[in-house]
């Protein structure tokens, strides 16, 4: 995958959860809402997790009830509902996670550049900051 995100893969995973809510348990072992690139997909996934935690059905009506129309346009939910569910969901989930980690690494690269030129920070402080951020990424992706 050349890119650090795929809207179609995100849509397919959300569609699979909608059509087979039992899949959410496996997905939750790998993904967090922040792993989704599209803000609307993050929000929809958050709502799915909340519904699951509240022992409520994960379906279109309950999702719409909990979504704020300012956050997610109905057309996005319709695109998810019209997407074909996938059979090997975990392979798609791993692609989303991989892209998420790469985006975090790209952000860290920007942070490294800023920290490296920060005059008020010693080299050891800069290293500690960078190592801390890298550690967060590595433990979150495991």
Model-found features: residue ranges?
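Interdomain "pre-motor" coupling segment immediately N-terminal to P-loop NTPase/helicase cores
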Residues: 84-142
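Noncatalytic partner-interaction/assembly domains of nucleic-acid and motor enzyme complexes
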Residues: 1-99
């Amino acid at each position: 995958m050349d890119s650090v995100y795929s809207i179609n893969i995100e849509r397919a995973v959300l569609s699979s959860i909608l059509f087979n809510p039992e899949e959410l348990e496996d997905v939750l072992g790998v993904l967090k809402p922040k792993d989704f690139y599209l803000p609307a997909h993050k929000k929809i996934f958050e709502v799915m997790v909340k519904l699951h935690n509240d022992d409520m059905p994960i379906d279109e009506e309950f999702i719409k009830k909990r979504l704020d129309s300012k956050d997610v346009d109905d057309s996005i939910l319709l695109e998810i509902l019209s997407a074909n569910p996938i059979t090997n969901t975990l392979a798609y989930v791993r692609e989303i996670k991989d892209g998420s980690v790469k985006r975090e690494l790209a952000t860290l690269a920007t942070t490294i550049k800023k920290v490296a030129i920060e005059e008020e920070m010693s080299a050891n402080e800069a290293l500690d900051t960078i190592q801390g951020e890298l550690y967060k990424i590595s433990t979150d992706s495991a």
